[in-house]
Amino acid sequence: MMQLIHHFIENGDEVSFVSSAKDSVYQEDLSQLEISCSFVQLNDRSFNTFVEELNPDVVIFDRFMTEEQFGWRVMDSCPNAIRVLNTEDLHFLREARHKALKRGEELHVGELRSELQLRELAAIYR
């Protein structure tokens, strides 16, 4: 995600970072990059008002669960915003690899089929 943030900054774009996660000692200090950071509540209509006021041109979701939670709200509130799912890390593939590793076996294609795969692919297609 930081590579994307740096790319947009280098192109002169204004970047806003929005998260529903609590602050952590492990998070990047985005204020050094002059990025506005905001906290939003999950399952709360206040996000709709927030994103309408922000009125972004592009919204990047860092994982499919974030797209599931907020994508439809962005679509409703900012229908012209381009919505992008960052797929540098496919969670269904990571989970399948982890299970195969725990069993000490190779990963087989059939093991990729899961509810997680369907959810993540649905987020990509949206």
What residue spans do the PLM features occupy?
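Membrane-proximal helix-turn-helix segments that form the acceptor-binding/catalytic region
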Residues: 108-126
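Conserved nucleotide-sugar phosphate-binding/catalytic loop shared by glycosyltransferases and other
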Residues: 25-46
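Structural motif
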Residues: 18-22, 41-42, 61-65
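A short acidic, amphipathic alpha-helical/loop segment
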Residues: 3, 29, 49-50, 69-74
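Short N-terminal targeting/anchoring amphipathic segment
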Residues: 50-69
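N-terminal subdomain of nucleotide-sugar transferases
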Residues: 1-28, 32
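Short, conserved loop/helix-junction motifs that constitute active-site signature segments
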Residues: 54, 74-79, 124-125
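Active-site proximal beta-strand in glycosyltransferases
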Residues: 78-95, 103
